[in-house]
Amino acid sequence: MYNTDIVIIGSGPVGLFAVFQAGMLGMKCHVIDAQEVIGGQCITLYPEKHIYDIPAYPKIAAKELIKQLESQAAPFNPVYHLNQQATELNKHDDFFEIKTSKNTLIKSKVIIIAAGAGAFGPNKPPIANIEAFEGKSIFYFINDKSKFLGKNIVVAGGGDSAVDWAITLSEIANKIYLVHRRDKFTAATESVRQLRHIAETGKIELVTGYQLNNLDGHNSELRSVIVKDLQNNIRKLDANILLPFFGLKQDLGPLANWGFNVRLQHIEVDNYYYQTNIKGIYAIGDVAHYVGKLKLIITGFAEAACSLHHAYSRVFDGKALHFEYSTNKYEQKQ
């Protein structure tokens, strides 16, 4: 059995920043993640997607953000347990025992849940025979945007993923159609502004008021995407790629049975220290819910700092935390 101060469940950007924050406070960390590599959705779903709201970076690719966060945490020697889920929790007065799907046992004083969307998968559009085109002409996640060079692409959806990928791929695609059932998009205001600006050039065509209806192709190769509006008007869009972005199915998995207050696959926490209803267990990032919650990476970073400062006295048996600025702490570590 391993013995540590903090167990962090999830190795996305918020989980990695929590490793750094814990290290700055002198806490040892073990990290559990169901994926084979660290990085969460940033690596698994959109490694090449640019993120625009990280301080000091006008834009940064998701995979580069993870690389930098991993490097920032590395001096504190975290132990990663990858390709396994946290499955069982045993509570004791002043510590927890966690068991994983690979029978790894870890004893820890504090648990930080930074599981993002939990176990995730795409919400697929209800189109007949869609499976025949998946992986060849239809993709729900983008790991390598170069495969779309010179293609005619239908992007479907109205949120951040759909709008951001339409903008990004417009730089290399021959033509982009963005299909959305409404006239208004729910993506970030600046992203929508960029989208409409590019649409004026003709590089992106906004097909609003329409929904996906059918597919036309042969041997897994798409030739066109058929869309329909509320009046049953049909349009055939010449395209060899379809990218549906209708969000993710969220599933807390075994965590749902650990006794937390759960609301719509999110763990409820207080909005001071982000502690769950179980003392010593915190939830941060997208998995956490509280009044006023903003689902931003930078919000998760702040939650990591607050929760770990609050956890300090539990880890060190009631010892008061003497606050220091990061300059002094990190230079001492180096």
From Swiss-Prot:
**Its Enzyme Commission number?**
1.18.1.2
Per UniProt, the keywords (alphabetical) are: FAD, Flavoprotein, NADP, Oxidoreductase
Known cofactor(s): FAD
* Protein origin, superkingdom: Bacteria
Q: Does the keyword Cytoplasm apply?
A: no
The enzyme class is oxidoreductase
Report residues binding FAD: 33, 41, 46, 86, 120, 286, 327
Q: Which reaction does it catalyse?
A: 2 reduced [2Fe-2S]-[ferredoxin] + NADP(+) + H(+) = 2 oxidized [2Fe-2S]-[ferredoxin] + NADPH
The record's comment on cofactor binding reads: Binds 1 FAD per subunit.
Entries under Pfam families matching the protein: Pyr_redox_2
MF term (GO), any: ferredoxin-NADP+ reductase activity
Subunit architecture: Homodimer.
Family the entry assigns: Belongs to the ferredoxin--NADP reductase type 2 family.
Q: Which PANTHER family match?
A: THIOREDOXIN REDUCTASE 1-RELATED-RELATED (PTHR48105)
The protein, known as: Ferredoxin--NADP reductase
